[in-house]
Amino acid sequence: MEAIKTARLPGRCRSCRTHRVYPIDVRKYPGIADTKTGKAFLAIAPNKSEENMQKIYDILNYAAFDQPNEANLTAKDLVNDFGGAKVKEAWSRNVETAEKYNDPGTFTTLIGWEWSSNNRGANLHRVVFMPQGGDVANQFIPYSALDSDDLEDLWAWLDSTSEKTGADFVAIPHNPNISLGLMFAETRLNGEPVDAAYARERMKWERNIEITQIKGDSEAHPALSPNDEFADYEVYDFALTPDGARPAPTKADYVRSGLKTGLELEKKVGMNPFKVGFVGSTDSHTGMSSAEETNFGGKGSTTQCQKNEHIQPVSVPLKVGIWEQQDGLAYGQKVILSQSLFDAFQRKEVSCHYRSAYNSASIWRL
């Protein structure tokens, strides 16, 4: 949440051992400090030492999975203590900020959020955005994984909210590579097989997919494409579980094999649920663009560069060892407006912007 300050001293993610994390300083926010979660945090971590921040991060990680933790918190506690009015307040601030800085044709903002489903450690996150402004966005509270971690429930909510408010939505799945075999699965989360109705709903909302970002590349894996010498490009296989497990890759985790599965399903059910365009992203959650070498925002607060630090090609010490190269996005449209951006995504006239020695992008239409 934008207005909640982060602690100055970070902990480290147990999954990768290097990713720095920044739990909130609950003492500054009575609405959180007075909750069961807030009181537990204050008792366990009375100061903002790195050791204490690590404790808080570990508690959040284990509580989210309803696993034993030092504070005896559950996932339900987190929902009760961080949901409700706090979500509405944060959403209103985000909408207000987007409206404030929107300058159509010069700097176009889009209102959206991340539906962060983490089904048993499987990354099923969807980034959702809309072309409409605050007058529409303030008519609803974003649907989150706290409401449901089943993507079909998200689609149903998008359907009903679109009908009620007139909002149009685009949902983009990201990080298939750590989806634990669920992103391109032939079986739905409810155990039923993928059918034509499922395929229609998925293609209605999810016409593109993220193929590469800082948490690795999702196009291919050397174990699945042994004859492709480039399939080992930026492999990242840490699951989003507290123990940082590294499960074996499956064909349902990677775009190349997922496209093939889609063609097979089209023969079976009459429609392809995985006929998607490709985008590349940062997943930095900073809001800073990194499209210019002379104005590089970094992959996060630990890798931000000072002014002019990267004007010349130099060797920069690695500050965060787990992240891969972040990527960019291009789209096929002459005018940078929120509606034209939305339309380009609907047409799948978007691109994966692989980063290398030079900035380059291609537009794909599938």
Regions found by a protein language model. Give the residues of each.
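Extended, charged catalytic domains and RNA/DNA-binding interfaces, predominantly
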Residues: 1-366
